[in-house]
């Protein structure tokens, strides 16, 4: 069973990095309502589009999701 996107994303945290995956990881870490148990693209994508308290480039998110699927 695949670990949740959030769990994988937390392995990418690096506050000193300017890489989009590290930036998203830091944002998600601070976001109490992030869908932490989801491994569903639509759930996470809709959250980022409609509910997140931060703004993030969704093209970068698509690339990050591909990395998640390929890990």
Curated annotation (Swiss-Prot):
Pfam families, sorted: YozE_SAM_like (PF06855)
Family: Belongs to the UPF0346 family.
Protein name per its UniProtKB record: UPF0346 protein SAG1509
Organism: Streptococcus agalactiae serotype V (strain ATCC BAA-611 / 2603 V/R)
């Amino acid at each position: 069973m695949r670990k949740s996107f959030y769990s994988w994303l937390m392995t990418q945290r690096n506050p000193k990095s300017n890489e989009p995956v590290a930036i998203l990881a830091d944002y998600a870490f601070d976001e109490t309502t992030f869908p932490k148990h989801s491994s569903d693209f639509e759930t996470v994508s809709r959250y980022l589009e409609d509910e997140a308290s931060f703004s993030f480039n969704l093209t970068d998110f698509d690339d990050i999701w591909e990395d998640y699927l390929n890990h």
